[in-house]
Amino acid sequence: MGKEKTHVNVVVIGHVDSGKSTTTGHLIYKCGGIDKRTIEKFEKEAAELGKGSFKYAWVLDKLKAERERGITIDIALWKFETPKYNVTVIDAPGHRDFIKNMITGTSQADCAILIIAGGTGEFEAGISKDGQTREHALLAFTLGFRQLIVAINKMDTTKWSQDRYNEIVKEVSGFIKKIGFNPKSVPFVPISGWHGDNMLDESTNMPWFKGWNKETKAGSKTGKTLLEAIDAIEPPVRPSDKPLRLPLQDVYKIGGIGTVPVGRVETGTIKAGMVVNFAPAAVTTEVKSVEMHHETLTEGLPGDNVGFNVKNVSVKDIRRGNVCSDSKNDPAKESASFTAQVIILNHPGQISAGYAPVLDCHTAHIACKFSELIEKIDRRSGKKMEDSPKFVKSGDSAIVKMVPSKPMCVEAYTDYPPLGRFAVRDMRQTVAVGVIKAVEKVDKAGKVTKAAAKASKK
């Protein structure tokens, strides 16, 4: 069997008609988890519908349709393999949802693939002031993505033109550099997702393309195809090496056992014997046991939904939205206030200082006041537009200072991504999304249980 390949998540971004579905469909079709029977079924249907040419995008549309109808499609269909990695494609659907999903999304992608349509007029539409190309790239950077691959698609429609390719590379390098990416570390690949050029195999239609190269701290890498560029992603650092952060989903009282908090390990690990602290409750105690699906675990790892038994803590002391952390390793603390970059998605009026909507951040659901609008930012370049704006409205991006109305524990996105993204809810819809830049923490003496005091002395 050999050792299992490392898993990486990629998100595919780009303007609506850039050919994201076709390109993704092609990779999944050729290297992926779609079994032969499914493909034959699709091909037969395609032929009957006169789609004899069998578009890869159609595979993806079928998968999406089945997924939307609630037929739980084996998520393996969204996977494909490279020599080094098992790759999962995190779908980037319609624009509005995409921004929301990307920020509140549970899965964090390791790399973004930006697909750009090379056709005349198409590239210009995607990159124009209203196009989504810039905005998706800026969002990816704001959310902490540092690995990017740019695929210039539909090269067949440009008659495989080297000049057109170079023109696009120059333009895209310019705007991704403005955003903050280093173009030298970004592989650019000219492809045809439809015909398959430079997808898995080197194209014979573009003999002028000598290959992509990228320079990173780890050294420089080169290759010819999109698949090779994906295979050259820097291996992700999994969050099990970070200090523990476990936002509580619920707290149960179980007869004969005691208090059992439940939640998903976001970073770090949790094990029996650990002295943990709960923020903002400021309770410290010892973990007696950890279990998942009614089985005892030696340790809970990132992604695990665990229940753990704690000593001398009542159900009244801790609640959903509290964050459990290791008292000896960067313990979580209450947040007095925090600064965040927010993007206003849909708010009917103007938002000014004093606005106090509900924030959903990890499992916490707490009203927070926009206490100060610090600066307004251009969403497409990420540059500052004005200091201390009087108000912001739909479509704007701003840096704001926020003050929770009740004790809350959040973290900077760069330290603990799952605890540093939030959605702003008001009028029963998502009004804005944000990323936390910095947190002002409260030091307060809290309740230390006997069990914790004893365990600490060991």
From Swiss-Prot:
Binding site for GTP: 14-21, 91-95, 153-156
Stretches for region G5: 192-194
Ranges where the record places region G1: 14-21
Principal cellular location given in the protein's record: cytoplasm
Start and end residues of each stretch annotated as G2: 70-74
Keyword annotations from UniProtKB, A to Z: Cytoplasm, Elongation factor, GTP-binding, Methylation, Nucleotide-binding, Protein biosynthesis
Gene behind this protein: TEF-2
Domain of life: Eukaryota
Record GO cellular component, one term: cytoplasm
Region of interest called G4, as start-end residue ranges on this chain: 153-156
Described function: This protein promotes the GTP-dependent binding of aminoacyl-tRNA to the A-site of ribosomes during protein biosynthesis.
Modification N6,N6-dimethyllysine, positions: K3, K316
Coiled coil (residue ranges): none
Residues the record lists as N,N,N-trimethylglycine modifications: G2
Localisation: Cytoplasm
GO terms for MF: GTP binding; GTPase activity; translation elongation factor activity
Residues that bear N6,N6,N6-trimethyllysine: K79
Domain tr-type G: 5-240
Modified residue annotations for N6-methyllysine: K3, K30, K316, K390
Family note: Belongs to the TRAFAC class translation factor GTPase superfamily. Classic translation factor GTPase family. EF-Tu/EF-1A subfamily.
Region (G3): 91-94
Organism, as annotated: Mucor circinelloides f. lusitanicus (Mucor racemosus var. lusitanicus)
Protein name: Elongation factor 1-alpha
